[in-house]
Amino acid sequence: MTALKNSFNRLGCVLLGAFLSGSALAQTPDVQVTEPGFKVFQFPKNQIPRIDGSFADWDVVPDRHVVPIEEMWDDSRKHQGINKSTLDIKVKVGWVEGLNRLYFYYEAYDDFWDFNTLGLRNDTYEIVVDADLSGGPHIDQFRHNQEALTRFESFFLHQNVHAQNYHIMTPPTEGKSWTMVWGPQQWLKDLPYANYAYDYNFKHGEDGVLKFEFYITPFDYASPDGGPAASTESKLYEGKKIGLCWAVIDYDGGPGNNGFWNLSKHHKMYGNASMQRLFTLMPLEAQFRKPIEAKW
């Protein structure tokens, strides 16, 4: 009798285990922004980057804060690995206490700079920011309740509202805006919420190095129809963790792109803030603190 009871117990455990395993397999785990992440350098208040195209202000940023192309991958799978003789990228990100701005320094070498049309087709640095880690979809294509809301309705309700996407032209064709804000909040790309400066010496189809600095202002709520007055800036402070990601869309003269170099392992990070990378707003470096602060 005891042996029979033990057999039933073992059978029950097996069936329960199979049920739980099947349930777990049937559920797709939610993607999340997790460690390991990257560091956002804190500029001293008397060394705020001047957006002037000289870039000397960025010399104080240590190399450990640089995000190189080695952190990215071509998720279009046109390239099996990194070849710096055709494309090389490095990015620095900074912030300043008291200003709700994210500063960027972008430097890239390309063997074929593509920027001769007025359409969206352009060598592009695409960035997405979710400064309160609210996560989830923020473009109409990935909207919830797709049976109730059309893409058109969702665009004017949700697009770029809790996380923002910028398609930055590197560099822009003459006559074209420096960035496409992917939503109705076009004021995001203008002063005082953004500014930019480029430096390059090449023409379309040539190789060379582009240097570019800019800042943007992240918003926890960027009103789709009420403008800045109806919107809520993200509050930036020391130690805060934010969602941030980027991709480089490389064109080389052909009909389509020649690579989508992504900082995220998820291709759809451009429209789902849960697929971004984690960035932490760092304290001042020791040499910029007062002596008592450095000891503390």
Located regions from the model:
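Structural preference for beta-rich elements and adjacent junctions enriched in aromatics
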Residues: Q27-W296
